[in-house]
């Protein structure tokens, strides 16, 4: 599994530090991300980081289950498991996967002069709509939930 992570998953990830100089990243509609609280190993400096999980990666990873059945791992779990390898100089204190659902209603006025242009604008707004739902696990860490919602 480590080999799959290093060769296929890790190169596709974007690691983002969140601080006053690096604001919270934009998460696309139905986008998933891993938020982490890390501590520098030799210092007490805290680092908050987000890994936006690319939609291009398959959500499930097939692993060898023998001849009789197939085994799969969830991509989010694999990334979370190897989080400490992504930041080797840090200790992983907390982590949480979340998913963003954005307002994707499309309103088109039939009497618009340029119907094609109206559709183009509506589709652009659809990708960047307001967040209407945040999906987290029930047992998620309250501190990390507060961090991503503020």
Language-model regions, residue ranges each:
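N-terminal non-catalytic structural scaffold regions of very large proteins
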Residues: 1-150
